[in-house]
Amino acid sequence: SIMDRRGKDAIAVDALGAPGFAPGAPKEGFDAIPMWVADMNFPTVPTIPEAIIARARHPAYGYFSPTEEYFASIIRWHETRNGVTGLTKECIGYENGVLGGVVSALNIFCSRGDNVLLHSPTYIGFTHSLENNGYNIVHSPLVKDENNVWRMDFEDMEKKIVDNRVHAAVFCSPHNPCGRVWERWELERAMELYKKHDVMVVSDEIWSDIILGGHRHIPTQSVSEDARSRTVAVYAPSKT
């Protein structure tokens, strides 16, 4: 269904003309058509606002701790959706969004001023978050193969890791903005490389629930026991 989002503080329509977005509002007689992939014009499934409204009716908004149901729901989702087993509540942490989780993980693995490996093209949220927190970005460009498919350049990745003394990487799976759903062999080879050079991996998997038919998301942590121990996977329900 088509929603009128004007006046609801939606960046997709109310921020036209703001820095970093569309240069200005449409001319008179023309409509703004939201086509932002990261903020699709789909209504939220009714059960979610219903649950929020029901909770908001209670007047206490003090400190809280996650419930057992919260942890069980996440564990069940990963088991049934992604085939990840063995998760416990101790494996799960809450962060203020994926980018907050990325930075928090890097703050554990790295010191300010350290070099962090990212693939390019790079999601601008990574760029701003890492630079604003004092990390240096080392890009390893993705390359197109003979079928015009974006692939990781493993030789370039290894050279960048060694030359720049990289010990942490931000990995995007599925990749934003290229849209690649990585195949198992690609993930295995990347994680073997990270293991070889003791690189910790922060894997942004926020897009894993929006995948075209014929493809399957494989969680980075699931490709080996070593990958499980060196990967921090970050998810959010905000895309779906």
Language-model-derived ranges and their functions:
Residues 205:
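Walker B catalytic acidic pair
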Residues 201-202:
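Residue-level marker for buried hydrophobic side chains located in beta-strands
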